[in-house]
Amino acid sequence: MIYYSYVPKDFTKHVMGMMTNEYDLVAKKFILNMNTDEASRMISKWIERYHLLETAQQTYRRRLNSEPVFSLLVHFTYSYLPGLSESECWEKFDKNEPAFLVQVEAYLFCRTSDAFLLDEKTQKVLSKTDKQDLLKINRKIFEICPSSESFSYIGEVNPISCGRYELVRLTKPKKSIKELQAKNWTNEKHVTDWTWRLTDKAYKEQLEQGKRVVLRFQSLIEKNASLDEKKAYFRALEGYLGYRGVRQQIGNLYHLEKRLFKDKYNQPWFDHGARTLKLSYMKKLKSPIVNNSSYQEAEAHFRSVLTEDLNKKYEKWKAKSNKTEV
């Protein structure tokens, strides 16, 4: 199966789908150039090598035959050209010159079964977290898919990240088996202990922003200005993706800010504009690009969306620049 995305919400959702369905082996991240045919050529090779366009029924038959199965995540990205400031990029954009770096980030995932992982010599199931066993696993994959990439266990590589978010694994609470069974920890359907959270950098930036909102309260003579600032800040907190790891972090941030306000002014924050946050939960979303679409169709869709988005951002930059000049 091939999944496409160009915003964090869709990308993180696809990765969570991989984790839920036990696609826990991953190849290194590939960064492919969209301004050449590099991305198209690589994806065509992967489709043939890993049978990515097979139906769910065909994939199921492979699993029954003790074969590994694969999925590909294709994430479209863009950024300012290296070495150029924001203004320089928009000036180039105004002249119809190349101003942005447009790339594809590609992730190959693999799902295996105990039957596939069974070592015929030792009659033991190979461990994905053992280095020597992982070499054997990759050899077994190579025998079925010649020229295959090297795969690693998802928990042993650098966290997959997207924008302000990174994939992490939550540890199960240290409770007795009886307590866990009472809460259906092991019997709950489609549950994964993987989630997304803010990166350390994003978390620290959000923490500092919260401190500024609290500390500026004293310097704002017009308290309505402080209230407006808080309202905007709370909306920003509520705008993060609603994964449990993120919600937990936002809750921690909010608690720290309430305590800071109390310590600084000896007054409850809720008496001065604070309110209970309404944090979202992730829901099933319909992807704007249909799964298993051809790469050419997916790229065309992304470029259309990108052009519209860049034009809007350019107009905002232009209006801001004109206002600054006046």
Label the predicted regions:
Residues 1, 9-14, 153-326:
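Right-hand nucleic-acid polymerase module
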Residues 1-157, 320-325:
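Conserved polymerase palm-domain catalytic core
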